[in-house]
């Protein structure tokens, strides 16, 4: 069996340019069983797929999953080897920069170097938090985001050994709200940002924008899990059109898809304009819902730890909301147990993940994209 290596994210989006499809980027905070199920669904549907993990989840000290960049990469490679599938990307999501000072940039370089050493083939630089409200125009307001994004993009290019790589950048902080509701990225903001990056010799494949989505689960006031229907598709189309009109070949990266009805994605999402769709918390839900049945003691211990740790900071909120919003932090303290699940439990998680991934790939119109990318690479 061939040793499987991830393909470059840039090749995926170059190959699929003009194709009405969304590439699923699966963030699997507990990869065992679940990554294999997603990979198997990708192979059976001939769908290219990305596996991603964010800085907060996986850094040099393990983040809140307990996995270093190398650990996560190895888990994905193991799943690809088991399934014998080749059309996948390992993506470093949300390499967040929130201050922009030299200390933070140096720690970011060290993280990126670890991701490069591990074998990641795509990177998302997220300096969207850096916005100067005192700026006289958009260019000044975005200056720090532009500077930090440029510096990190050049660092990747200078240290990846000449290999191609995928690049995602971000403008507009996802999930941010003000007194009027969710703050949305404007078309002008997107084109100003991308044009400045182009002038700095930075050429991203993807732009993440704030378009009404939020990360994680969505709950009502009583603590019930509800669908997320807040993504502003007309605004998303307007941003995509402005990018095209500016002569830029950059797709939209849609963050925060968990909870969005798949029939809405299937029938109404502008596929191709939205080129990448992030699905993260959904796979976490698969883990917990399966563990509830197959590993009830583990589930109860993780529930209790989460409530004991976070209830004092969330006085008055239902326990279901507290758990749903914070259970991701339970992976690290329970890693020794979640990475030692029974074969029966892993089989169940894989089966559920397989079924769920089939539906996402269908809703994203991903079927057949692996062959398109494979043919592109063979002809390159």
List PLM regions with ranges.
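Alpha/beta enzyme core
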Residues: 9-16, 32-57, 69-70, 78-82, ...
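Active-site mouth loops of central-metabolism enzymes
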Residues: 21-32, 63, 91-108, 179-185, ...
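C-terminal helical cap(s) of enzyme catalytic domains, especially alpha/beta-barrels
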Residues: 133-145, 219-225, 287-304, 350, ...
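Glycine-rich, N-terminal phosphate-binding loop and its surrounding beta-alpha-beta segment
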Residues: 62-97
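Extreme N-terminal cap/leader segments of soluble proteins
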Residues: 1-33, 63-66
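Glycine-rich phosphate-binding active-site loops on the catalytic face of alpha/beta enzymes
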Residues: 126-134, 271-291
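C-terminal hydrophobic structural anchor segments
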Residues: 285-339
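C-terminal extensions of enzymes
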Residues: 1, 319-380
């Amino acid at each position: 069996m061939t040793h499987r290596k991830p393909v470059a994210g840039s090749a995926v989006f170059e190959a699929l340019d003009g194709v009405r499809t969304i590439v699923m980027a699966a963030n699997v905070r507990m990869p065992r069983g679940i990554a294999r199920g997603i990979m198997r669904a990708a192979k059976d549907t001939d769908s290219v797929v990305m596996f991603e993990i964010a800085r907060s989840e996986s850094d040099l000290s393990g983040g809140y999953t307990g996995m270093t960049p190398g650990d996560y990469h190895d888990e994905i490679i193991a799943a690809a080897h088991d399934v014998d599938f080749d059309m996948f990307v390992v993506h470093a999501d949300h390499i967040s920069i929130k201050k922009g000072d030299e200390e933070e940039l140096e720690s970011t370089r060290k993280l990126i170097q670890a991701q490069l050493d591990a074998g990641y083939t795509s990177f998302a630089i997220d300096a969207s938090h850096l916005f100067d409200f005192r700026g006289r125009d958009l260019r000044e307001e975005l200056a720090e985001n532009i500077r930090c994004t440029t510096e990190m993009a050049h660092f990747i290019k200078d240290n990846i050994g000449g290999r191609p790589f995928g690049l995602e950048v971000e403008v507009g902080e996802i999930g941010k709200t003000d007194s009027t509701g969710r703050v949305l990225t404007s078309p002008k903001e997107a084109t100003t940002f991308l044009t400045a990056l182009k002038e700095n010799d930075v050429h991203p494949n993807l732009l993440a924008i704030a378009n009404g989505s939020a990360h994680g689960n969505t709950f009502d006031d009583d603590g019930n899990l509800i669908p997320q229907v807040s993504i502003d598709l007309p605004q998303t189309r307007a941003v995509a059109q402005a990018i095209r009109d500016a002569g830029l070949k950059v797709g939209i990266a849609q963050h925060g898809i968990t909870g969005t009805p798949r029939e809405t994605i299937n029938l109404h999402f502008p596929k191709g304009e939205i080129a990448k769709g992030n699905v993260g918390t959904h796979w976490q839900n698969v883990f917990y819902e399966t563990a509830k049945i197959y590993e009830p003691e583990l589930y109860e211990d993780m529930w209790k730890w989460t409530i004991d740790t976070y209830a004092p900071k969330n006085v008055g909120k239902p326990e279901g909301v507290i758990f749903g919003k914070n259970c991701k932090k339970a992976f690290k303290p329970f890693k020794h147990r979640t990475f030692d699940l029974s074969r029966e439990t892993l089989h169940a998680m894989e089966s559920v993940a397989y079924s769920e991934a089939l539906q996402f790939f269908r809703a994203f119109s991903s079927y057949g994209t692996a062959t398109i990318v494979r043919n592109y690479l063979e002809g390159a």
